[in-house]
Amino acid sequence: SDLSLDRTGRVDIAYMSQLVGCEPEKLIADLGNDIFRNPAAIKDDEPLSGYEEASEYLSGNVREKLKIAREYAKHIDSGFEKNVAALEKVIPKNLEASEISVRIGANWIDVEDYNRFLKEYAKADTSMFGHPVTRTKMGEYKIEGKYQDHSIAANQTYGTSRMSSYHIFENLLNQRDVVIRDRKEVDGKVYYEVNAKETQLAKEKARQMKEAFKSWVWEDIDRREKYVERYNELFNAIRGREYDGSH
């Protein structure tokens, strides 16, 4: 059957039922899984609003649609179980932790967890500042008190004498290059020259930190569940539109 779409691209049930000469309810039943009522498109003053072609409804952010359909089926109208069943069939397969790549600085990781990592991995002394990592409104990360910690952990084990673990972590959080320059002065002119040896040392600490973070994120079971769910909701929720050639 050819579906009549109104000017918004939605299925025009009122118009079609007049055309075929039957009750809207019967038409809706006859169309079966060719159409779905999208809760997000329902208008309160139009009892026949919100119907969409299957290819339209079962594409886009299907995770979000499934969440809404479940709510509607549970609290408003069990008829939405039809939506739930169809969406469950097309939802992208959940990615496991092992299939998700995570990098320091990703904004879907909570700031508290960056703090926790700094404390647990780099043995950061948080007694003075509590939570040194903050994220500004512009999305830039800052680490408070990064000059205060003179421990071996900060300046040797997880950092270097020229770039502490705090500085390295802050650079990684902001996707900045880890590079160390020496101040030089020639004929009263000041310039900065890359110190290759020190840069290499700091880059190696940065590499170790990145690797450690990748496994650290998934080590704790609650943290793993939280981020697997969040990642799938944010980045694995979209389904492309498939046109069914049958009508």
Walk through the language-model features, giving the residues of each.
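ASCE P-loop NTPase motor core, strongest for the SF2 helicase catalytic module
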Residues: 233-247
